[in-house]
């Protein structure tokens, strides 16, 4: 079908991630239906015929190839899940398409705070720039680029599902707690460390991909003061 240039949709039913690099390269549309249950067929038809605008996001990373996965017998977190994977994903954690488009802008938060501050506000504007009403899952991730201990490449710290009519824009507010900004040291103690924290907000995780353009906005927060221990 694909070779004959017949418009084709690959409907995939799976309980977890699969290696589908050939399909991603050659099939113009892929719908992951997971396990839809009794009314799964109706839901798939509603999406395919445009009666429902999809807004689902991946709860797992779709890797480009099996070799990207760590050895099954290794319990080291290096390379596991979106939090520690440093390669290029086929489809990243948090990714999902819609029949409309969303644009992120005006990411605002304090540029510097003390390590002991309990709540730090983050605001971002999301606009539906397409021609169809739809829902978006706004996701906030943080990373610690200058830490010398093992920390995640990125970590989800908040998300909100919003509904926007075509052309509508909304300002979304998150609040980052001390625990959100903390790291766990080699002794298992959770601490807020002085230094830079990168904040990224968008429609998926801010990781390198083979197929999906990165649509996030980012800023940086400077934490000053002494190390603040949360768990004692």
Regions found by a protein language model. Give the residues of each.
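Cell-envelope/glycan interface and biosynthesis
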Residues: 1
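Short, conserved secondary-structure segments in the cores of folded domains
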Residues: 110, 158-160, 188
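Intrinsic-disorder/low-complexity, polar/charged segments enriched in Ser/Thr/Lys/Arg/Asp/Glu/Gln
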Residues: 119-121, 169-173, 216-218
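Short acidic, flexible loop segments centered on an aromatic residue
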Residues: 131-148, 154-156
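Intrinsically disordered, low-complexity Pro/Gly/Ser/Thr-rich segments with frequent PxxP/GP/PP motifs
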Residues: 148-184
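Terminal connector regions
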Residues: 177-231
């Amino acid at each position: 079908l694909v070779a004959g240039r017949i418009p084709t949709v690959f409907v995939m039913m799976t309980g977890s991630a699969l290696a589908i690099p050939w399909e991603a390269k050659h099939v113009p549309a892929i719908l992951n239906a997971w396990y839809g249950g009794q009314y799964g067929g109706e839901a798939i038809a509603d999406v395919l015929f445009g009666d429902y605008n999809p807004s689902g996001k991946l709860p797992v990373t779709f890797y480009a190839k099996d070799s990207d996965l760590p050895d099954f017998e290794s319990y080291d977190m290096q390379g596991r899940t979106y939090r520690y994977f440093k390669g290029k994903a086929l489809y990243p954690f948090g990714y999902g398409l819609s029949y409309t488009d969303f644009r992120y802008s005006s990411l605002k938060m304090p540029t510097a705070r003390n390590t002991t501050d309990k709540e730090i506000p983050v605001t971002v504007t999301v606009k539906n720039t397409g021609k169809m009403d739809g829902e978006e899952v706004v996701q906030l991730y943080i990373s610690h680029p200058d830490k010398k201990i093992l920390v995640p490449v990125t970590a989800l710290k908040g998300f909100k599902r919003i509904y926007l009519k075509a052309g509508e824009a909304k300002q979304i507010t998150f609040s980052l707690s001390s625990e959100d900004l903390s790291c766990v040291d080699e002794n298992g103690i959770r601490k807020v460390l002085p230094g830079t924290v990168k904040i990224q907000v968008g429609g998926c995780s801010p990781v390198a991909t083979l197929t999906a353009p990165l649509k996030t906005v980012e800023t940086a927060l400077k934490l000053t003061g002494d190390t603040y221990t949360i768990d004692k």
